[in-house]
Amino acid sequence: MVKLDNVTEGVLDVINDNKFSQTGAFNLRENGTSICHGDSEHIKIKKKTDKPGIDIYIDGKTDGEAVYIPVVLSKSGMTDLVYNDFYVEDGADVRIVAGCGIHNSGCNESRHDGIHTFHVGKNANVRYEEKHYGEGNGTGARVLNPVTNIFCLLYTSPSPRDRG
């Protein structure tokens, strides 16, 4: 278990409602680096090899599990760009808790650009929660720039007009 400093713990309490712990499926990114992560039986997290970020694989047997992937920036002048891709298999039931908190007590801009892409299988139930938070007594900006892309299979019932 990684020992977290008071700033990181305080920011995590806000963006994850005091629920983050280093158990189950999780990945904590701090100041541009993944500092700890864990897998569960049905959720596996792999570090990307071609760009910053992670791939999260959620198998179809996942039933009511949660995965936490918070980011904390506490250095002034830091820019963090991350690509997180979620692969949710058919029939999975999962809660994904993301979010970023910036503590900036300096005079330079601190920025997090988080790009999340979801590939959702048939009959999967995904609850996605994302919180963003900025604090600090410095004059530097706290910029949070999330992007969310979702790819899924949709089934629509034929309308009366389509049925003839």
What positions do the PLM features span?
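Short, Gly/Pro- and small/polar-rich lid/capping loops
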Residues: 1-40
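Conserved beta-strand/loop scaffold segments within soluble protein domains that form the structured core
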Residues: 27, 35-157, 161
